[in-house]
């Protein structure tokens, strides 16, 4: 009934991936250290209105990397046995030019991310909650968790007068969605807010690397925020492996700011769809007003495992 017992009994717990059939319910496993909030929208809205909503929504690739780094034996296709950061590089944009720095940068990213997870509001995309529950237990957290898929609606409804900073690779799509009028994409009332945009580089495998490593790129992005956008009220991020270290640094540098990792939900928040990210699962969407993602697939991303982010 706690994190230790949960991990001790991990081998008895059925696990799924995106392609698994539904698993028949057999035995119930209870971990009372980590529980789902039963009042999610109200609690997250209250935090947001107090400018205290900080959450990173770690992705499945990042969760698998953390577990492997911590030597938690979870069967998954999201790392290679002798190359555990392969998917971090191919999917999430983690990079370094000098392989001699590999372990140094692993440790930097893990330390920043764990520091963040221990202090933040933990959210998960429930389709890979199985990774996150194990990761949270391995970090011995004692917290409530939330469904991150409700966060963008909370932001849309409660951002009156706020300055929102988008940090990600798809500035053209997000800006076009905003300029079209976000209210036109949704059939519920949307707040009036203004926008800043900070474009992050595409650094997945096959792309050119702009600096020596992701660490140096993060430092440059943080300096740009300090110089140009420090009066933001809410930051929303969709930038892969850059997310956790950026959020961890921003939460320490800026007090009373909302800093939220939305990933692909950034597109949906602004009424943008692609072939891999349809709008049809949103009952609140005014579908005829949504726009298709504008960005073409970048050079070097021909074999990217998640082409949903581009035309």
Predicted regions and their residues:
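Structural motif
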Residues: 163, 233-234
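C-terminal functional extensions of proteins
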Residues: 242-311
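A generic structural motif
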Residues: 83-88, 193-202, 260-266
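A short, acidic, amphipathic alpha-helical segment used as a generic capping/interface helix at domain edges
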Residues: 39-40, 107-109, 216-228, 243-244
């Amino acid at each position: 009934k706690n994190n230790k017992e949960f991990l001790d009994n991990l081998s008895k717990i059925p696990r799924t991936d995106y392609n698994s059939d539904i698993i028949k319910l057999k035995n119930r496993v209870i971990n009372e250290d980590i529980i789902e909030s039963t009042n999610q929208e109200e609690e997250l809205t209250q935090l947001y209105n107090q400018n205290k909503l900080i959450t990173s929504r770690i992705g499945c690739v990042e969760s698998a990397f953390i577990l492997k780094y911590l030597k938690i034996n979870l069967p998954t296709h999201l790392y290679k046995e002798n190359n555990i950061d392969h998917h971090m590089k191919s999917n999430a944009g983690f990079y370094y030019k000098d392989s001699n720095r590999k372990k140094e940068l692993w440790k930097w990213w893990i330390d920043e991310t764990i520091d963040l997870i221990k202090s933040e509001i933990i959210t998960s995309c429930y389709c890979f909650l199985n990774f996150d529950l194990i990761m949270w237990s391995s970090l011995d957290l004692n917290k409530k968790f939330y469904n991150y898929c409700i966060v963008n609606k909370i932001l849309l409804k409660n951002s009156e007068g706020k300055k929102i900073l988008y940090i990600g690779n798809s500035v053209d799509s997000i800006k076009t969605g905003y300029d079209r009028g976000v209210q036109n994409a949704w059939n519920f009332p949307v707040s009036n807010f203004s926008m800043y945009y900070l474009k992050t580089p595409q650094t997945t495998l096959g792309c050119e690397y702009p600096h020596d490593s992701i660490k140096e790129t993060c430092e440059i992005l943080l300096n740009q925020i300090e110089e140009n956008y420090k009066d933001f009220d809410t930051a929303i991020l969709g930038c892969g492996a850059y997310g956790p270290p950026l959020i961890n640094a921003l939460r320490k540098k800026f007090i009373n700011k909302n800093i939220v990792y939305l990933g692909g939900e950034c597109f949906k928040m602004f009424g943008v769809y692609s072939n891999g990210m349809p709008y049809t699962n949103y009952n609140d969407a005014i579908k005829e007003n949504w726009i298709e993602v504008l960005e073409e697939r970048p050079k070097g991303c021909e074999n990217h495992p998640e082409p949903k982010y581009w035309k």
